[in-house]
Amino acid sequence: MRCCGVCAFDAARGPRRLMRVGLALILVGHVNLLVGAVLHGTVLRHVANPRGAVTPEYTTANVISVGSGLLSVSVGLVALLASRNLLRPRLHWALLTLALVNLLLSAACSMGLLLAVSLTVANGGRRLIADCHPGLMDPSIPLDQGPGHTDCSFDPTRIYDTALALWIPSLFMSAAEAALSGYCCVAALTLRGIGPCRKEGLQEQLQELTELELPECKRQENVQLLHGRQDFQALQKTWV
């Protein structure tokens, strides 16, 4: 039994939706990259310990998030190309492969960010600054007091607030990337006629739409050339 909400790609509105999803993936991917860069520059570079090891929050929130953002931009570009070239199987397979990988990566990123936020909230941010404040794992000691406080080059209370303020938007954007990538997977499978979302006669409908669009494009080009020629003749008369 087909699910109309999932298998929503059709010949009439599917290409336009795929184009919008591609643009959304490019936008969300760039914003996620920006948030990851700000998170690294303002928070996470302070909590790396001198031995080169980093907290689990760093790995989940920065590395995976940045990778998901980069891949989302790539999926968005391929989706834009596929929406304008609906009869090219190579683009369909490329879209399916990249979207499936990005779906898994974005889902893993969302789960990792959710775990990082949960751990950070549960211990009040002490896990983030454990290397700088080795004696502050005791919840009864305030973050701005205790042994090791004078060794830190940053304000530990702001690290907690800033990390959460950047992690939570990144969490929602990663979830959005996963959802948009899922739509791209469904669209690619529908275009190839694979799975429960295949539609009989879809390729023929797309072929007819493509053939109808070509004369329209040529007509618009002819109109533009005619208007340009008329403007040029009017300009010549003005100079004369």
UniProtKB/Swiss-Prot annotation:
Keyword line: Membrane, Transmembrane, Transmembrane helix
Family membership: Belongs to the TMEM54 family.
UniProt cross-references to InterPro entries, sorted A to Z: Beta-casein-like
Gene from which this protein is expressed: Krtcap3
Organism: Mus musculus (Mouse)
Subcellular localization(s) per the UniProt record: Membrane
Protein's name in the database: Keratinocyte-associated protein 3
Gene Ontology cellular component annotations, sorted alphabetically: membrane
Transmembrane residue ranges: 21-41, 63-83, 95-115, 163-183
Bilayer disposition of the protein: Multi-pass membrane protein
Source organism superkingdom: Eukaryota
